Amino acid sequence: MGFSSGKSTKKKPLLFDIRLKNVDNDVILLKGPPNEAPSVLLSGCIVLSINEPMQIKSISLRLYGKIQIDVPLERPQDASSSSLSSSPPKIRKYNKVFYNYAWDNVNLKEYLSGLRGQSGLAGSSSSSNILGTRQRAQSTSSLKSLKGSSSPSSCTLDKGNYDFPFSAILPGSLPESVESLPNCFVTYSMESVIERSKNYSDLICRKNIRVLRTISPAAVELSETVCVDNSWPDKVDYSISVPNKAVAIGSATPINISIVPLSKGLKLGSIKVVLFENYQYCDPFPPVISENRQVTELNLEDPLNESSGEFNGNGCFVNNPFFQPDHSFQDKWEIDTILQIPNSLSNCVQDCDVRSNIKVRHKLKFFIILINPDGHKSELRASLPIQLFISPFVALSIKPLSSSNLYSLFSTTNQKDENSSQEEEEEYLFSRSASVTGLELLADMRSGGSVPTISDLMTPPNYEMHVYDRLYSGSFTRTAVETSGTCTPLGSECSTVEDQQQDLEDLRIRLTKIRNQRDNLGLPPSASSAAASRSLSPLLNVPAPEDGTERILPQSALGPNSGSVPGVHSNVSPVLLSRSPAPSVSAHEVLPVPSGLNYPETQNLNKVPSYGKAMKYDIIGEDLPPSYPCAIQNVQPRKPSRVHSRNSSTTLSSSIPTSFHSSSFMSSTASPISIINGSRSSSSGVSLNTLNELTSKTSNNPSSNSMKRSPTRRRATSLAGFMGGFLSKGNKR
């Protein structure tokens, strides 16, 4: 975010941005071909935050699409010859705005009057969080222009946060964005302009968005098989097929190659599969420029071995026992492989037709080497057309647009964004949708691993293999529990106390066997897990080794069904059975780490994201949770005061609460003592005259330290006088 100064360096808003709702990374997704795709809703708000009053005339917003084509005027051979010279190649630029949608200007008077009616202030807000302010216009469909009047008047916005909502219906026939093709681009941008008074320059906020198109789940291309069958006379009969014509960018597609040799002694050599991208572009004038670029390739040096699997004990292949290692003559060669499509939109573009200017298609080309009996090599070539499309179920990486969230002024040119100096990292599209299929998808995408095919992501599960499911016999078996983890429904339901004890007993037996095997083999002890074994021994009832021998639980010790999947080999190293603290591990010891963990990726968690990245992820919702200050306030109950009791010969015990020991009570109890006449004794054996004298001395000597220091004695004296007066009245009666 950057502002350039005009006539005044003041009056710059703290925030001026365009925010879209219900979109992922500012991507508008169209579903279906242009003639069948439904319309989509585009909604959002213009966010403005100012720290001082600002006078503005109008706020406008528009969405426009732009196509840019650079047509070279020289042929490739001429360009190569001219590259030797210092003169740059000649090109013809073609720029055109093919789509423009403008919203009505915000009626500021109605907006401010609505705010005054709600809060009595012209948009002022005490909250500094923009997400917490709920200041919205009265209507988004009937916004009137302020520029129509002869003398446009300005309105004053007080200090605070503002958001101006907008919405529009976009047609489904919009051309899609194209960014990574050389010499041709299709981009969409939103532009908001705040027109201010003549003393200040206008403010402009631009935000680039992407319009991407995907195919509908009912499209024929998702289930259409592409196949090429042909024959090379006296050589081979071949068949190459792909199960789905439409392949999502970032996914994988299986490839089947079937070759029948027609001559004896013919051997199969290497196979190369290349994905080519053909794109054509032109401006309104001829000619049409057609170019190709390679997207990815797959090399199979030994296709029979690589496609058939591993060797078994008999020297044959597991998946196809008819294949022999010497590549002798067979009746048929079957090769099944998988081609991984790059997950970056910077390397390839989806199949598209943008107006009559840009056309993109993709094709798979196969190069198969055949080794003849005399030793010379022949090459078989074939091609298959496929369709690449963008799927919201697969996360894609793309380079961010440089002009995103660009702030500029009308009076200035060649502005530079402050964030442009920073290194541009690739951002990921549809990362939220991909998280539904599992976090492993993003991890495999970053590490270059395989990604599930699009048919696995878009189609419902296939139940034709249900005949191999294990039937429930009505009795509880240990096999069903062992094949299910503790976090699965089966493991959580059947994991009783007896089962856990049985599991611990089995684990204790296996650990004992492992220890005996290590002792018999004479393995050297390790000084790493003495404390680890001791911490685990009380639970498993396994005696802790005294020599500090390290105990490792291999896969074989856990049983055949302990977390392993048939046909899948685990790359995870053995894990120490240890819960000891870090200080118990020596400094020179390296603990085994699972190969799937990628610790350098965790370094990104320490980086503070930029404003653009932070706003693209709705971790914090628009509505903040309510606060409950009364409920969370820690109110400590008051402790009641203690009243001490003295001997009855001097004072009387009292149980009166502290709150009632006030001066008013003492003054009211002193009056009966003044009306006492005569010398009478109370039931307690205390002379009433003595009490009167004591009371009079206390009243005449206010500086008595003894009475000041003992308020309990003063209260007891008053109480005694009250009781003496009461007794004297009774005697008179």
From Swiss-Prot:
<dbReference type="InterPro" id="IPR014752">
    <property type="entry name" value="Arrestin-like_C"/>
</dbReference>
<dbReference type="InterPro" id="IPR011021">
    <property type="entry name" value="Arrestin-like_N"/>
</dbReference>
<dbReference type="GO" id="GO:0005737">
    <property type="term" value="C:cytoplasm"/>
</dbReference>
<dbReference type="GO" id="GO:0002092">
    <property type="term" value="P:positive regulation of receptor internalization"/>
</dbReference>
<dbReference type="InterPro" id="IPR050357">
    <property type="entry name" value="Arrestin_domain-protein"/>
</dbReference>
<comment type="subunit">
    <text>Interacts with RSP5 via its 2 PY-motifs.</text>
</comment>
<dbReference type="GO" id="GO:0071444">
    <property type="term" value="P:cellular response to pheromone"/>
</dbReference>
<protein>
    <recommendedName>
        <fullName>Protein ROG3</fullName>
    </recommendedName>
</protein>
<feature type="region of interest" description="Disordered">
    <location>
        <begin position="636"/>
        <end position="658"/>
    </location>
</feature>
<dbReference type="Pfam" id="PF00339">
    <property type="entry name" value="Arrestin_N"/>
</dbReference>
<feature type="region of interest" description="Disordered">
    <location>
        <begin position="518"/>
        <end position="566"/>
    </location>
</feature>
<dbReference type="GO" id="GO:0005829">
    <property type="term" value="C:cytosol"/>
</dbReference>
<dbReference type="GO" id="GO:0030674">
    <property type="term" value="F:protein-macromolecule adaptor activity"/>
</dbReference>
<dbReference type="Pfam" id="PF02752">
    <property type="entry name" value="Arrestin_C"/>
</dbReference>
<dbReference type="InterPro" id="IPR011022">
    <property type="entry name" value="Arrestin_C-like"/>
</dbReference>
<comment type="similarity">
    <text>Belongs to the arrestin family.</text>
</comment>
<dbReference type="GO" id="GO:0005886">
    <property type="term" value="C:plasma membrane"/>
</dbReference>
<feature type="compositionally biased region" description="Low complexity">
    <location>
        <begin position="523"/>
        <end position="540"/>
    </location>
</feature>
<feature type="compositionally biased region" description="Low complexity">
    <location>
        <begin position="646"/>
        <end position="658"/>
    </location>
</feature>
<dbReference type="GO" id="GO:0070086">
    <property type="term" value="P:ubiquitin-dependent endocytosis"/>
</dbReference>
<comment type="function">
    <text>Involved in resistance to GST substrate o-dinitrobenzene (o-DNB).</text>
</comment>
<dbReference type="GO" id="GO:0031625">
    <property type="term" value="F:ubiquitin protein ligase binding"/>
</dbReference>
<feature type="region of interest" description="Disordered">
    <location>
        <begin position="693"/>
        <end position="733"/>
    </location>
</feature>
<feature type="short sequence motif" description="PY-motif">
    <location>
        <begin position="625"/>
        <end position="628"/>
    </location>
</feature>
<feature type="short sequence motif" description="PY-motif">
    <location>
        <begin position="460"/>
        <end position="463"/>
    </location>
</feature>
<dbReference type="GO" id="GO:0000747">
    <property type="term" value="P:conjugation with cellular fusion"/>
</dbReference>
